[in-house]
């Protein structure tokens, strides 16, 4: 309460960095979005407008008028034309209008600017006690489209043809372009107290007084770069906030209760498509549930059928899966300053590779994260020592950002690393693995699989994913051990932004 007036005064001072209405998007001149077409793909695409009912036409007409008034779009005679799509907003009957740019995206050279890692961002919150999350108003619409690229964004409507002056949702490079803008803005901050993923910004501090100062600095860069915040979506001075689909606090990382409730209330799928949707939804959180793969192994086969046939056994696993999510563990943050080493458990079975990362914190071994993947055909025939090495490499790659520069304990139920070091001549995949492993500092602790419950259980289950047709020389390449990739998360975040904003 004592800081409420301070925060109110702060946002009043930076009122020019706060959106005044739903069409006040801000305007940056720091960067522009340029669409580069692939060589030989310069031929314009011209598609017809899709049929709309009277209510949809009225909604679209209103949207176009507001966009044109705000300088987001302009009339055009472009040879390009794409259809509009109305997306129902979250918890509302209103429509949010987007353009179907799928054919344009196929012709576009992809921007190589990397998105920040979700896992890395979450781990950087370690030690923080106070959080604020900031939501950008319109986000992409603050960025100009390069004049030479505007005609490529043209769209057709019953009210004429228009093109975007500002960057719209739906362009394949929009996320990378906006991420570049936010990174450019945040790099001027004198410290590491703010993180961004697309338009989701979190400020984290260990006390309130410092947090208020840091919030001021973030508001200042928003002012300097012409970006605006949607105040109704900002959460300030919180001990716990939702960030990137997770609930974060001083204690650790949790699943968002509303998402867990959706899982618990999910009806029994009757078609393969419905089952695939369910498995995809829970996949975002599979790093919290070590035995999720065991419970979903049969479902991953069932989803391939048009109609799903449930047995008492598979229906019971579906029920147990929901229970597991209601009892999900808290993932602790990796403590880089602690003298306690990280502990990496790895294991191999004929079906899977598995790894679990933990660390002793406050006298207890705390769970930080887990990963597992299905073995491909070649790996299924590996002898024990080679399979264990494959699991070690997989685990090191998964948690490389944590383990690379800090000594840790490697617990495995085989003398695999000693075997690798004992080889007089090393070539092929062993040479690549050895070269990679030698970049880490660790102590090997032999531990039987029966005592190593986390990684052992993970590797003894079947994991979804197509791992066939992998050549021997490709087996050492990095693989994503979680069900959802960053690019899928970007799509998920943008899709939800379309529905909610």
Spans of model-derived segments:
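Flexible, low-complexity interdomain linkers flanking nucleic-acid-processing modules
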Residues: 1-9, 251-278, 434-501
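Reverse-transcribing Pol proteins
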Residues: 1-113, 194-199, 204-205, 245, ...
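C-terminal reverse transcriptase regions that engage the nucleic-acid substrate
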Residues: 35, 192, 197, 232-333, ...
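Conserved pre-motif C helix in the palm subdomain of viral-like polymerases
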Residues: 58, 126-129, 140, 159-192, ...
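Catalytic palm subdomain of template-directed nucleic-acid polymerases
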Residues: 88-94, 104-110, 141-144, 189-228, ...
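A short, polar/acidic, helix/strand-boundary loop motif
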Residues: 105, 160-177, 361-390, 415-418
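RNase H catalytic domain
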Residues: 383, 393-449
């Amino acid at each position: 309460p004592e800081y409420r007036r301070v925060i109110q005064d702060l946002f009043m001072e930076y009122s020019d960095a706060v959106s005044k209405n739903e069409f006040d998007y801000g305007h940056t001149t720091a960067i522009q979005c340029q669409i580069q077409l692939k060589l030989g793909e310069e031929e314009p695409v011209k598609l017809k407008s899709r049929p709309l009912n009277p209510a949809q036409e009225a909604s679209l007409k209103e949207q176009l008028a507001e966009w044109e008034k705000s300088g987001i779009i302009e009339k055009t005679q472009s040879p390009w034309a794409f259809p509009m799509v109305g997306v129902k907003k979250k918890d509302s009957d209103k429509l949010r209008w987007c353009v179907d740019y799928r054919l344009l995206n196929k012709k576009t050279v992809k921007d190589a600017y990397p998105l920040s890692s979700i896992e890395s961002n979450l781990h950087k919150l370690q030690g923080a006690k106070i959080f604020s999350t900031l939501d950008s108003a319109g986000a992409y619409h603050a960025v100009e489209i390069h004049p030479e690229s505007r005609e490529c964004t043209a769209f057709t409507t019953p009210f004429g043809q228009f093109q975007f002056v500002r960057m719209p949702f739906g362009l394949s490079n929009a996320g990378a372009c906006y991420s570049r803008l936010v990174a450019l803005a945040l790099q001027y901050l004198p410290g590491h107290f703010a993180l961004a993923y697309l338009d989701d910004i979190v400020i984290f501090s260990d006390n309130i007084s410092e947090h208020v100062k840091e919030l001021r600095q973030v508001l200042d860069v928003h002012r300097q770069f012409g970006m605006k915040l949607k105040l109704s979506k900002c959460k300030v001075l919180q001990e716990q906030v939702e960030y990137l689909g997770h609930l974060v606090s001083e204690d650790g990382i949790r699943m968002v209760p509303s998402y867990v409730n959706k899982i618990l209330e999910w009806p029994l799928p009757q078609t393969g498509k419905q089952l695939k949707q369910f498995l995809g939804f829970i996949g975002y959180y599979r790093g919290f549930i070590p035995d999720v793969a065991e419970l979903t192994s049969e479902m991953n086969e069932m989803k391939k059928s048009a109609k799903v046939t449930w047995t008492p056994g598979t229906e019971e696993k579906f029920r147990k899966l929901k229970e597991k999510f209601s009892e999900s563990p808290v993932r602790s943050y990796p403590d880089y300053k602690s003298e306690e080493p990280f502990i990496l458990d790895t294991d191999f079975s004929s079906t899977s590779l598995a790894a679990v990362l933990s660390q002793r914190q406050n006298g207890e071994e705390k769970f930080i994260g887990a990963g597992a993947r299905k073995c491909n055909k070649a790996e299924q025939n590996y002898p024990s020592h080679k399979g264990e090495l494959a699991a070690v490499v997989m685990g090191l790659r998964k948690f490389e950002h944590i383990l690379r520069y800090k000594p840790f304990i490697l617990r495995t139920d085989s003398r695999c690393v000693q075997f690798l070091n004992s080889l007089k001549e090393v070539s092929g995949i062993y040479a690549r693995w050895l070269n990679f492993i030698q970049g880490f500092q660790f102590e090997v602790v032999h531990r039987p699989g029966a005592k190593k419950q986390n990684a052992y259980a993970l590797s003894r289950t079947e994991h979804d994913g197509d791992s066939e047709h992998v050549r021997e020389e490709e087996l050492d390449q990095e693989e994503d051990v979680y069900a959802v990739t960053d690019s899928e998360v970007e799509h998920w975040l943008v899709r939800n932004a379309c529905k909610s904003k």
